[in-house]
Amino acid sequence: MSETVDPVVRTASPSPAAFHYGPAHLIMHGNAAFLAAFGRGSLGMPAREVMTELPRSAFELMDRVYREGRPLARRLVLPGGEHRLVVVPRADPESGDVYGVTTHLRAQGPPVHPEEETNP
């Protein structure tokens, strides 16, 4: 999700999207699909405590984007099939300091074997 994408489009997306704050990736906002998947109780909680079905590599990707300040994507194999996780840094426009990340998780098609997980 980039800064140029209309917030209404992100909110209306049928795929889970969320804004995570700080190095603990506290969930500050989720679209309807995210809240349907993880519940309103997820707001304010660290992503690692809420999004337990995601593999460790998803959180490593979020950490890397937060640390390096550049967007990255990764294919993940989840129980529902193959998904693409896109993580984009959110930074202060004046200082450039990263204060959070946005995530967008979308299904990619038929299931694949876990050993086929790769970086895009």
Where are the language model's segments positioned?
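Sensory modules in modular signal-transduction proteins
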Residues: 1-36, 119-120
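Aromatic/pi-system hotspot detector in well-structured domains
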Residues: 18-20, 60-62, 87-88
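PAS/PAS-like sensory domain cap-loop motif
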Residues: 34-45
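Terminal output helix/cap of sensory domains in signal transduction proteins
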Residues: 50-77
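PAS and PAS-like sensory/regulatory domains
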Residues: 74, 81-85
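Short loop/turn elements at sensory-signaling interfaces that couple input to output
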Residues: 85-101, 109
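Sensory beta-strand/linker motifs that couple input domains to effectors
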Residues: 104
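Sensory-domain boundary/capping and coupling elements
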Residues: 110-120
